[in-house]
């Protein structure tokens, strides 16, 4: 018994300590890949067998499965114990034995990997090749796919029907699957299935949900080349008497076979990321997530309820309940199988114990001589060795079985524990959701009954703030409008007063006429009474007078009619004036808007120019003044030393004649020291002058080097852009994988169910779901109302203010609400931009103040130096005057002369330095004046431009294009200046950074090895290297000497590609390098299979340009009018199209000409690729003709394509006729 216990303990320790961490399972299948393995399911009787066809190559990984007689039993037991009930074929459902299609085959492979992978296992694929280690994340990822495949087996059966191997069931299954699963289940599908799928896709129109993917693959082909050699033949008899006979040679052709890889590409339309289904629609999960995120933004409590609603949506669905019950039954089946296995293990342990006890009994009973003789025979070495080997083999077999069983036990127990924890969490979430839903119902009822005070207060505050802002912003324009209104009212009052005066004068004249008429009548009556007898004589006079009166009255009536007409004319003029005023107001507003936009643009350009100029000034000051500062500090230190020495010497010189004899011996030493210091000062000043000269020289050299550096910078920027693009593509794939993984896990959480079936909870869930669904539209309405309130608040407040201000204005002069809104928007924009411009101007003023402060500091330093020099000179002169009586007067005089001369030289140099600083200040002031002049000239230009536009309205399009061409060289000059400053800064920072880099490289020598060890990919690196060499062949540094592929430089089967100045080799596995001579890996390593190909996203590259100007000089045709430029690869300034990707491009061009003879070329990198020509042979008469052409070229990254006119002219025409277009067909 003790031995049995030790045996069991050893086996358990072995399986627990080693089997869990280093258990390796290897499965193989015959290389045909078509052998079918029959596997009985858990719930099916033994006569019902389901056949699974396992493919050797899938989209995920190519895994060859090898079965050994030792592993088949364990594998069969695993498959029997772990097949879920969704894969079983029950006779009641009527499901037939059918072979899976291509999509189902891929799922079968994933299922096998999921069911048989341990927790931390390293699985060997492709025996004889490298072993691929799978991490926990990839295992979980595959497990999620296996669980999804179990769920979707039922959907495949329902959609596909009872289809067999054909493509009906496969397409149906693919239609209902996620995009990630369709990508995995592609595999090596049948041709019929693919053709059907493509036909259904390409018949429909392409929208934004579809993306083009290019399928590329390398196919090796054999090329036959005939190598011709000429062999001289024998000399025959010569028939000529004089001269030499010709030699005859024989032609021999030898066939030479070569391998060449051709790139085979095909275009395929697929759903973009985030879309799925046959019509590439948005996923349901993403739509729900969008809805829930919009709801969550409105209110936090509402968002929480919606999120919990999303988790509990499946509580009332019968399908979800059925899935949950199926999974519970499946877990119960697993538990029963585990119990059976534990019973079997206990039985085997009991059998071992019984055999051990029987052996002990036999040994105790049989103590005879025969048994002892047998024991003596058994004590020989050979028998002992045999017994040991047998025991070891049996022990190993038993140990392996125990490891497998214990690993399975751990796996099942861990899965059960995970399921139990997940169900517990779900129950907790359900309870929390029920409680939160009840609380939310109360909260929603409270919210519906009463509006929140906080929102109302916020709205009031917001309205008050908006009113204040409106009053601040609209005071000036409203005052101006009021002034105009008062002016117009005064003009109208004047016109009314004039009309009133006119009417009064008319009334007065009419009254006077009536009075005159009455007087005449009275005089006539009196004359009739007095002169009755003389009536006959007067009657003739009266008739004449009456006729004249009638004529006068007619004339006056005509005058009155004319006056009324004049009044009507004046009224119509007043109306016309009001209408014209309104029109002028509208025109003035439009002009003001245009002028404001132009002023903004001009101000922006001026600010940019001033900023660039200030940057240049700051850099020049930093380059010139900072080293001068260091030199001046050194000068001040040396002068301080001089003053200190002179102070030490001063008491010695002031002493009496007793010390003069000793001083005579010490004076030469001190003079030598002073001379050395003065020499140092002169050398420092000379070095300063030399540094200034070198700075000027370097500045000139840098100006010359800027043009060369521009091209290098552009190339580097393009290379970095490509690398960033590749990195972004990789990160997008990683993000898509992560999103798919999260979505898969989210789907798994929905499929989990509780162990206990509580009917009351389900009824509550349904009722709560109905209540929540009733609340959702109300929440939507609330969100919409709040958004409309927030968005339209400013507009309504503005309308109210405008209505108040316009209440007293007459109806004729009221302005429209739209005009006020436009004015309000314009004033808001102008105020914000003015604030920005004020900030920028304040920054500029601060910088100018800093420069002035720096110059003042330098001036003060120079004055300090001059004062120090004078202080050092004064005591020395005084001491010399006191002690100039005694001997050695000549020596002292000589020394004084020397010192005076040197100090004078120092003074002259300091004066020279001050002059240099003065010249620097002059240059600074000149630069500032230049900036001001430039700004004034630009403002004058801006003022004159609208006048020119008014005068040249028919040619306004040509004028705009001319302006763009005028502005572009100025911008280029500015950019060149900025680039020159950049290069200066880089050159200055390089020597300091190189030393730091060398130090950091010494410290980080050990780091790259560790990083490379961590970053070992599971795939061969040669595939990546080959792809990079095919794409970015322009990144290689080309030599100056041109060498083509005519010499066949690529070795070891590599293919040669001609470039602009050199060639590149696309090497075969496992070689790399410039000539395919460097070997990467061992010979036993497998080559990458390029025949399967790969899918890549096809970028959008297309351009369309036209030519509107006239062209009379031969050269490159500059198409100035650019309509389409996807990819930003065509530059109108040069007329060249730069290739952004390696691939096949299509170009088309049309050229119009009136000349008798026109010709030109389509140029690729300076080489004439195609020619176009047209000539009128009969006569030199000019005629209108249009040339068209197209080309399909395979081009490399960095190459340039343009059109060159060799002979003839192109007329100016608008709309244009001469065009040039091109686009990327597909990448290679």
From Swiss-Prot:
Residues 160-175 have a biased composition (Gly residues). It is found in: Secreted. The N-terminus is blocked. Multimeric. Composed of varying sized, disulfide-linked multimers, the smallest of which is a homotrimer. Proteolysis of the promultimerin in the N-terminal region, leads to the mature p155 form that is stored in platelets. Interacts with factor V/Va. This is Multimerin-1. Residues 1096-1228 form the C1q domain. Changing residue 1055 to A: Abolishes protein secretion. Keywords: Coiled coil, Disulfide bond, EGF-like domain, Glycoprotein, Secreted, Signal. It comes from Homo sapiens (Human).
């Amino acid at each position: 018994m003790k031995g049995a216990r030790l045996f069991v303990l050893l086996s358990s320790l072995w399986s627990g300590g080693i089997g869990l961490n280093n258990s390796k399972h290897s499965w193989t299948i015959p290389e045909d890949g078509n052998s079918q393995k029959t596997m009985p399911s858990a719930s099916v009787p033994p006569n019902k067998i389901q056949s699974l066809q396992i493919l050797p190559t899938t989209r995920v990984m190519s895994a060859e499965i090898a079965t050994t007689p030792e592993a088949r039993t364990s594998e069969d037991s695993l498959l029997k114990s772990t097949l879920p009930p969704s894969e079983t074929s029950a006779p009641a459902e009527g499901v037939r034995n059918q072979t899976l299609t291509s999509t189902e085959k891929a799922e079968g492979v994933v299922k096998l990997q999921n069911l048989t992978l341990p927790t931390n296992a390293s699985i060997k694929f492709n025996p004889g090749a490298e072993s691929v280690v799978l991490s926990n994340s990839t295992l979980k990822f595959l497990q999620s796919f296996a669980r999804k495949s179990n769920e979707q087996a039922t959907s495949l059966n329902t959609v596909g029907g009872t289809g067999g191997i054909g493509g009906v069931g496969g397409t149906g299954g693919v239609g209902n699957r996620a995009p990630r699963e369709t990508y995995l289940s592609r595999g090596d599908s049948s041709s019929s299935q693919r053709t059907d799928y493509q036909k259904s896709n390409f018949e429909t129109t392409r929208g934004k949900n579809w993306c083009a993917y290019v399928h590329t693959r390398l196919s090796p082909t054999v090329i036959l080349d005939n190598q011709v050699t000429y062999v001289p033949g024998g000399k025959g008899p010569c028939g000529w008497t004089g001269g030499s006979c010709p030699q005859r040679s024989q032609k021999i052709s030898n066939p030479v076979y070569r391998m060449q890889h051709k790139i085979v590409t095909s275009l395929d339309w697929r759903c973009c990321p985030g879309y799925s289904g046959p019509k590439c629609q948005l996923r349901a999960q993403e739509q729900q997530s969008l809805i829930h995120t919009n709801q969550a933004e409105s209110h936090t409590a509402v968002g929480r309820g919606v999120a919990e609603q999303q988790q509990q949506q499946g509580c009332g669905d019968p399908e979800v309940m059925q899935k949950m019950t199926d999974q519970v039954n499946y877990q119960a089946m697993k538990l029963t199988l585990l119990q059976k296995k534990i019973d079997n293990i206990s039985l085997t342990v009991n059998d071992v114990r019984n055999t051990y006890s029987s052996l002990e009994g036999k040994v105790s009973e049989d103590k005879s001589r025969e048994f002892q003789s047998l024991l003596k025979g058994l004590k020989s070495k050979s028998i002992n060795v045999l017994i040991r080997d047998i025991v070891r083999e049996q022990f190993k077999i038993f140990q392996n079985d125990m490891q497998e069983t214990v690993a399975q036990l751990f796996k099942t127990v861990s899965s059960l524990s995970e399921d139990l924890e997940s169900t517990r969490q779900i129950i907790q979430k359900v309870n929390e959701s029920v409680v939160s839903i009840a609380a939310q119902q109360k909260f929603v009822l409270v919210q519906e009954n009463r509006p929140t005070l906080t929102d109302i207060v916020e709205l009031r505050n917001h309205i008050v703030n908006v009113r204040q802002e409106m009053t601040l912003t609209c005071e000036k324009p409203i005052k101006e409008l009021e002034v105009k209104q008062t002016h117009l009212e005064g003009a109208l009052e004047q016109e009314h007063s004039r009309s009133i005066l006119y009417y009064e004068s008319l009334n007065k004249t009419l009254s006077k006429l009536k009075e005159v008429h009455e007087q005449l009548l009275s005089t006539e009556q009196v004359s009739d009474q007095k002169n009755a007898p003389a009536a006959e004589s007067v009657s003739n006079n009266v008739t004449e007078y009456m006729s004249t009166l009638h004529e006068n009255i007619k004339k006056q009536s005509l005058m009155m009619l004319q006056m009324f007409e004049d009044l009507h004319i004046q009224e119509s003029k007043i109306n016309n004036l009001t209408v014209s005023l309104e029109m002028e107001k509208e025109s003035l507003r439009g002009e003001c808007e245009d002028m404001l936009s132009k002023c903004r643009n001009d101000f922006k350009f001026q600010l940019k120019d001033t900023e660039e100029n200030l940057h240049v000034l700051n850099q020049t000051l930093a380059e010139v003044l900072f080293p001068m500062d260091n030199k001046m500090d050194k000068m001040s230190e040396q002068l301080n030393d001089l003053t200190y020495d002179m102070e030490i010497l001063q008491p010695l010189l002031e002493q009496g004649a007793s010390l003069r004899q000793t001083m005579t011996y010490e004076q030469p030493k001190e003079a030598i020291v002073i001379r050395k210091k003065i020499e140092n000062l002169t050398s420092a000043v000379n070095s300063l002058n030399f540094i200034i000269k070198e700075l000027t020289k370097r500045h000139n050299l840098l100006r010359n080097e800027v043009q060369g550096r521009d091209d290098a910078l552009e190339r580097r920027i393009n290379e970095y852009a490509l690398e960033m693009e590749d990195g972004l593509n990789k990160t997008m794939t990683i993000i898509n994988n992560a999103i798919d993984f999260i979505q898969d896990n989210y789907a798994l959480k929905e499929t989990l169910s509780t162990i206990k079936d509580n009917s009351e909870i389900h009824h509550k869930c349904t009722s709560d779901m109905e209540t929540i669904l009733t609340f959702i539209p109300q929440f939507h309405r609330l969100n919409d109302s709040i958004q409309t309130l927030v968005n339209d608040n400013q507009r309504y407040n503005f309308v109210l203010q405008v209505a108040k201000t316009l209440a007293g204005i007459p109806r004729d002069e009221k302005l429209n609400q739209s005009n006020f809104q436009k004015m309000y928007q314009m004033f808001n924009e102008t105020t914000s931009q003015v604030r920005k411009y004020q900030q920028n101007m304040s920054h500029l003023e601060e910088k100018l103040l800093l420069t002035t402060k720096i110059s003042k500091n330098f001036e003060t330093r120079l004055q300090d130096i001059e004062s120090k020099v004078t202080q050092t000179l004064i005591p020395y002169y005084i001491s010399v005057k006191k002690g100039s009586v005694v001997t050695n007067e000549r020596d002292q005089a000589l020394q004084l002369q020397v010192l005076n001369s040197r100090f004078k030289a120092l003074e002259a140099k300091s004066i020279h330095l001050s002059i240099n600083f003065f010249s620097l200040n002059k240059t600074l002031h000149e630069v500032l004046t230049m900036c001001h002049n430039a700004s004034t000239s630009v403002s004058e230009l801006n003022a004159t431009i609208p006048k020119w536009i008014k005068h040249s309205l028919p040619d306004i399009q040509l004028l705009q294009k001319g302006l763009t061409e005028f502005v572009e060289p100025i911008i280029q000059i500015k950019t060149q200046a900025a680039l020159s400053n950049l290069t200066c800064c880089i050159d200055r920072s390089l020597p300091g950074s190189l030393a730091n880099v060398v130090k950091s490289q010494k410290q980080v020598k050990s780091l790259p090895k560790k990083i490379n060890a961590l970053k070992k990919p599971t795939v061969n690196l040669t595939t990546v290297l080959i792809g990079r060499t095919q794409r970015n062949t322009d990144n290689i540094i080309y030599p100056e000497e041109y060498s083509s592929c005519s010499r066949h430089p690529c070795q070891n089967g590599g293919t040669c590609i001609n470039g602009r100045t050199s060639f590149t080799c696309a090497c075969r596995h496992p070689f790399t390098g410039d000539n395919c001579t460097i070997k990467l890996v061992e010979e036993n390593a497998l080559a990458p299979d390029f025949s399967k190909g790969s899918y890549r996203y096809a970028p959008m590259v297309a351009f369309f340009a036209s030519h509107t100007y006239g062209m009379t000089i031969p050269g490159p045709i500059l198409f100035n009018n650019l309509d389409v430029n996807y990819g930003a690869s065509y530059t109108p300034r040069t007329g060249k199209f730069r290739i952004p990707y390696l691939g096949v491009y299509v170009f088309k061009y049309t050229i119009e000409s009136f000349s008798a003879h026109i010709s030109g070329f389509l140029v690729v990198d300076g080489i004439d690729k195609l020619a176009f020509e047209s000539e009128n042979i009969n006569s030199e008469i000019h005629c209108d003709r249009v040339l068209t052409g197209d080309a399909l070229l395979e081009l490399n990254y960095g190459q340039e394509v343009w059109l060159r006119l060799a002979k003839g002219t192109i007329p100016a025409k608008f709309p244009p006729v001469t065009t040039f277009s091109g686009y990327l067909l597909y990448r290679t």
